[in-house]
Amino acid sequence: MRMGITVGFEHRFAVRALAKLGPADEYIFLYAYTGRDEDSRSESTVRELIAAFGRGAGFRVDLTKPSEALEQIYGLGLERVVLAGGPRLLVLLALLASLLRRSEVYVLPEYSAEPLDLTPLTALCDLCRLSPAKLGIVASVSGRVGIDDVAQLVGRDSTTVARYLKDLSEAGIVKSLGGRRREYFVDPLLTTVARLMQNRAGSL
């Protein structure tokens, strides 16, 4: 696995990322170029990380050209991206590249020792292509629910809902949980995004 980690002036967040989310076959430390003197601090952090772990490579992201920077990050083919520090634009571009490539994506918050898994958001592009009926199902599912429960929530017959859930499951938007009574699960992040998309569509 090729893992990319955004890096700023401090190395502790990147160290936490490697401790919590490693190991990986290859580590790419993404650091920013802004044209300012402070850039040398990020470069120094990357060198310290590579020396400390004995592996990895630095990748300079030129934030003065955001469109090119996005394409460069996307082109790295990262399978997992950890947002562990660096300028806000670097973090934003790394997140966007992750969503477009459908990589695993985690954020290392300042207030918690545990990384947050944002990978469900990689289905965002798929949500934009859903029909209103299927989007309504994603927006309605909370926790583990059965087909009949979903049908009741959205006001449709169970046969139609079962077909929609099968399509959503194959697309990776809904998780199908096995058992005699099959149940379905949508990550709360996706449920919220789908509901907000519904609200926005209703206001146009």
Curated annotation (Swiss-Prot):
It comes from the Archaea. Disulfide bonds: none annotated. GO terms for molecular function: DNA binding. InterPro entries: Csa3, WH-like_DNA-bd_sf, WH_DNA-bd_sf. Signal peptide: none annotated. Keywords: Antiviral defense, DNA-binding. Coiled coil: none annotated. Induction: Not significantly induced by ultraviolet light or by NaCl. A monocistronic operon. GO terms for biological process: defense response to virus. SUPFAM superfamilies: Winged helix' DNA-binding domain. CRISPR (clustered regularly interspaced short palindromic repeat) is an adaptive immune system that provides protection against mobile genetic elements (viruses, transposable elements and conjugative plasmids). CRISPR clusters contain spacers, sequences complementary to antecedent mobile elements, and target invading nucleic acids. CRISPR clusters are transcribed and processed into CRISPR RNA (crRNA). A putative DNA-binding protein it may regulate either or both of the Cas protein operons encoded on either side of it. Belongs to the CRISPR-associated Csa3 family. This is CRISPR locus-related putative DNA-binding protein Csa3. The lineage of its organism: Archaea, Thermoproteota, Thermoprotei, Thermoproteales, Thermoproteaceae.
